[in-house]
Amino acid sequence: MTCPDLKNLRNIGIISHIDAGKTTVSERVLFYTGESHRIGEVHDGNAVMDWMEQEQERGITITATTTCCHWRDVRINLIDTPGHIDFTIEVERSLRVLDSAVVIFSAVEGVQAQTESVWRQADRYAVPRICLINKMDRIGADYRRVLEQMRKRFTTRPVLMHLPLGIEGDFAGVIDVLEGRCLTFSETDQGATVETCDIPEERQSEVAAAREQIVEAAADFDDAILADFLEGRPIKAARTRAALRRGVLTCRLCPVFLGSALRNKGIQPLLDAVIDYLPSPLQAPPIAASPPNHQDATAEPALLPCDPQGPLCALAFKVLSDAGRKLTYLRVYSGSLRAGDEILNSTQGVAEKVARLFRMHAHKRERVTEVQAGDIVAAVGLKHALTGDTLCRAEQPLRLEGLRIPEPVVSLAVEPRHIDDREKLPAALEKLLWEDPTFRVREDADTGQTILTGMGQLHLEIITDRLHREFGVEVRTGRPQVVYRETVQNSARHHERFHRETEGRIQSGEVTLEIAPSGRGKGLRIVLPEDENPLPARLREELKKCLHQSCAAGIRTGYPLTDVEITIIEAPFEPGLTTEIGLLAAAQRGLSLAATQAGLTLLEPVMALELTVPTEHAGQVIGSLQQKHGRIDGLETRSESELIQARAPLSQLFDYMGELRSVTRGRGTFAMEFSHYDPAPDEIQTLYGLL
């Protein structure tokens, strides 16, 4: 049995490269749907969706913000995501729980580095999407070029649904190709009134050709449309829309619309497209849920449809510190949840109680008593929940796959300025750790300094700013440092036995393990095969946990060990003799010695860059990148500028924006994202005693 309201629900995200106009689009959506009585502007610092002080001051989105609105009797749960690579976890966790997405492109800049990154993230979760080519009013706007870039860079087929009425400064509206009409947006009421008119005679042939391309795309998903198309019979717009929707749901095509959010043009047709083409939770694929680790590990995952009558299964995808308490954002995939319910956090194996439930409107709340499958809410009272945890009923334990957490690449040493700051710092950092799984904290064993690790300089800058503003903690900061990775160059096998008296008891255990390189980008894999005398299940889990923790702490340098496969060849268990402490001590020391024998080496992060610079400065910029051990991957001429694609070690890119602005006289821009790890140079290996 399903809830009839689910067909009138959409869970969507707004994703794109930074500055493509995501939040500007979101603000118009709230205004035209009646959820907001004014249009907030990013450049004025009063956007509803950018509610953090840092967002308002910097004019960028830092945290994914959830709200809801209504259009054509359909409720839309909307998440506006950041575009900056330092906050990519916000996109990752949003796409993990959303049913669909709207991808925003700039008509001037086109497909940019972070656009490709968020597109790949959407591909990984098979998220259906539609697209808006925004900023059609800007000088240099070229929607045809953007379409061509989409065709070249993405496997999903773009289908142009609009043609522009005017270009650049004369952009006045759009031609709805499928319906055969012009749409303009009144300037007297900030675009709230949409006016229709006939297509000018001189554009008729252009529109007919564009409509033919739409019908061709639809015919791939409807044989009857294909037959009518080949026979030259008329095809109604409703049939075409239904076929296009099927293509969208399979992620094989994406309708593309035109607009200018800042000029209040093109948002209402985009909202119509959300309803017409994107799925309800009922049309989303069933979610795979497995028994928790302490249950039957051999059982096949259950495929749970979106059913309010099914077993409760929800994912905690975001945690905020709200006045010292946890506010946990949930996507409910199956079953229902009420305020006051006692539930199980199956990821951590602990009981939780839901005190209250809220529907979020940015940072404002609307209290609700119950939430059903398919919906997104926030809960208060979940004391243990962290990002990626599964919530279910104790009598029906289930476990969802967690989130893919990118590894941080930049670290920063901090010291409290005053004695009272030293006392407040640990609690403040703990609350920030709740919120952000890409943020890490450790203490330097030699200096005693607190080391913050994050996705980039901006990420850590925001963290330290929040320490001051939200928690009243002042810190001194050092220079940002690269977070390297350890790996091994060869294979090695080692047998280690631990036998020692500790506090009056003999602790004993032995392990034979092998470590081997697994290939760049493969991460860490620990293999613990079954044998004739297997360890008890609890000891197996503790052994794996111990090895994971040892690898995270590093072997020689304190940097995590990665791109290796560790196989437990033998771990004998003798009842009454083998102890947990002895077994784990043997494993820890055995791993250290095996990794050392296998030849430890350091890897450094390499970043993919996309730079836009004036043509006259391109040669100088390329030369400076090559001096930084960079590699040029591509060069594309765009009117009076050059688009440079390159890769360079992160260690060479700190403060690069200032250098680029100096070289280009303030006219150059760049974006970067993590690409891969390469062996660190010899001087770094020597510094850490590995050469």
Curated annotation (Swiss-Prot):
Keywords: Cytoplasm, Elongation factor, GTP-binding, Nucleotide-binding, Protein biosynthesis. Residues 7-282 form the tr-type G domain. One of its GO terms (biological process) is ribosome disassembly. It comes from the Bacteria. One of its GO terms (cellular component) is cytoplasm. GO terms for molecular function: GTP binding; GTPase activity; translation elongation factor activity. Gene3D superfamilies: 3.30.230.10, 3.30.70.240, Elongation Factor G (Translational Gtpase), domain 3 (3.30.70.870), P-loop containing nucleotide triphosphate hydrolases (3.40.50.300), Translation factors (2.40.30.10). GTP binds at residues 16-23, 80-84, 134-137. It is found in: Cytoplasm. Catalyzes the GTP-dependent ribosomal translocation step during translation elongation. During this step, the ribosome changes from the pre-translocational (PRE) to the post-translocational (POST) state as the newly formed A-site-bound peptidyl-tRNA and P-site-bound deacylated tRNA move to the P and E sites, respectively. Catalyzes the coordinated movement of the two tRNA molecules, the mRNA and conformational changes in the ribosome. HAMAP family: EF_G_EF_2_B. Belongs to the TRAFAC class translation factor GTPase superfamily. Classic translation factor GTPase family. EF-G/EF-2 subfamily. This is Elongation factor G 1. It comes from Syntrophotalea carbinolica (strain DSM 2380 / NBRC 103641 / GraBd1). The gene is fusA1.
